[in-house]
Regions:
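Signature of dsDNA virion morphogenesis modules
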Residues: 1-194, 198-202
Length: 204
């Protein structure tokens, strides 16, 4: 079976409808990169009998192909470093750090849950993140404070294991690939961290 592959893009003309709306706590994140719970790391300058209730994880990973299906038609989407950078800037400039949901099935933000840190790894500033060393440069991370006791219990119980973004992107068709080609590309990207656009050009 052949699958179309689309590149995620923001609108070049600054159309405000495009971009990230919120970040949800979910059981199965699209990027398959669960967040790290910092409750096990006790600092000396802290009340050691209480949890910090902080989670951190990846929101977007460059060149990671994600399976999607709409109206019964399967396809893949992928974001490059440039789009991820633009999306993170837009999300933060619009002060969306309180836009945190429990799954995407609700329109209500969680109370007492907020994002207080957001960064993108690169060769110069933040090279690697402990627990996520395998993720490539250009990965967007957020750190979230969970003061809501009900939500925190759900995090500890494993009901929420990662982040999932809710966003509207333009889809730019870049190629069509078979099952075998997709599996090969994913294996190469994961193994040598090679940008997807470079690999696609070598196939032409």
């Amino acid at each position: 079976m052949n699958y179309p592959v689309y590149l995620l893009e923001l609108d070049e003309n600054g159309n405000t409808k495009y971009g990230l709306q919120d970040i949800a706590l979910v059981e199965s994140p699209a990027y398959q990169s669960s967040f790290v719970k910092f409750d096990e790391q006790k600092l000396n300058f802290a009340i050691q009998n209480e949890e910090k209730q902080i989670v951190m994880g990846a929101v977007m990973i460059p060149d990671k192909m994600i399976y999607r299906e709409e109206n019964g038609k399967p396809f893949y989407v992928v974001a490059n470093k440039e789009t991820i950078y633009e999306a993170s800037q837009k999300f933060n400039s619009e002060n969306r750090n309180l836009n945190v949901k429990a799954t995407h099935e609700t329109d209500t933000n969680l109370s007492d849950v907020f994002i207080f840190e957001s960064f993108i790894t690169d060769e110069n500033r933040v090279q690697k993140v402990k627990g996520f060393e395998e993720l490539p440069y250009g990965t967007w991370f957020v750190t979230m404070k969970v003061n809501n006791p009900t939500v925190w219990e759900q995090v500890k119980a494993g009901e929420f294991t990662g982040f999932s973004l809710e966003a509207l992107f333009k889809l730019k068709p870049i190629t069509t690939l078979s099952d075998d080609e997709i599996n090969t590309l994913m294996s190469i990207i994961d193994y040598i961290k090679c940008p997807l656009n470079y690999l696609l050009n070598t196939l032409k």
